[in-house]
Amino acid sequence: DRQKQRIVIILGIILALLVISIPVYGWVTTFIMPPRVTIVRVNDTSYNMGYLLKMMRMVQRQSESEGQRVNLGTLPFQFVNDLATDELVLQGSQAIGIKVTKEELTERLHDEFLRDTEDTDRAATEADLLVEFRERYRQFLNQIQLTAEEYEEIATRTLYREKLEEHLGATIPDQLPQVHLFGLGVKTAEEAEEVRTKFARGTPFADLVAEYSVDPEAIRTDGEIDWVPRDVLDATIKDFIFDELVVGEISEPVPQFNSESNQEFYVLYHVAEREELRDVSEANFENLRSLAVTKWVTAQRELNDVTTSFDSNQYAWLAK
């Protein structure tokens, strides 16, 4: 009888432990484990779900304070990619001798939080400005719920990217071959053929833009895109525009897709002029410099140990 009682007691204890362990396991798997899961790793540096959640909340709070809404459907995936990119930029920049000093970081923070005091308070002393900076910085950190160290890591990565852009931008020539490009977007392939027929019969391109364009801004500018170097254009059209489209002619319609309206439309391009060497505009230079960084990062991904892991289950945890 005593042996049977012991067996019953032991079974009761085991059953009780099982009953207790189920909610404990659920609590651990729901609240303890997910924040520690690594989602980005670049060589020896890693970021986990907890960090991603903190960054997302920061952006949400900033956006809410500015009266804007955040697209939570795409934001986490973009953050994961950006974390990997920013870490590659930081490590790669340091590897080629680029540095961000404490003084540069301090100057950037002061510029950010004292920007509106430059013209309105010229009589303020350095001590006054320091007090104002500290108070504004404190309020900002409280709003986004980050520590000073956490926010300064973000600002440091931004500075590294800017310095890398400057470094790579030094290799971009001041002058490049360019075309004076115009574009006309129309609703259907039939309209595109009408445009081509009328252009062949002598109708000016600007008149065709005014009659057929689906873009009001294009009508205002007569369809002018800009003087552009090759690499500023989308990879799907740049070689065609530069190597095949004759000056003064109009292109075949190029199918495009508008993700906002979920509709297909067609674009016809027109090169009015071409110059073998032309000064690169500031806007085009910025585009080329950004493209240079993108290409550099792509190459760095092949040279470094980079892992990203973010799936639907992790997204569901973030969305809770």
Task: Write out the residue ranges for each language-model feature.
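Surface-exposed aromatic
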Residues: 70-75, 178, 224-226, 277
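FKBP-type peptidyl-prolyl cis-trans isomerase
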Residues: 34-62, 93, 159-164, 182-188, ...
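Short, low-structural-confidence N-terminal segments
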Residues: 1-74, 302-320
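A C-terminal, polar beta->alpha supersecondary segment
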Residues: 37, 90, 122-124, 133, ...
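N-terminal targeting/tethering segments
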Residues: 29-146
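Proteostasis/folding factors centered on peptidyl-prolyl cis-trans isomerases
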Residues: 131, 135-183, 211-215, 235-282
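Soluble non-cytosolic domains of exported or imported proteins
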Residues: 50, 69-87, 99-103, 131, ...
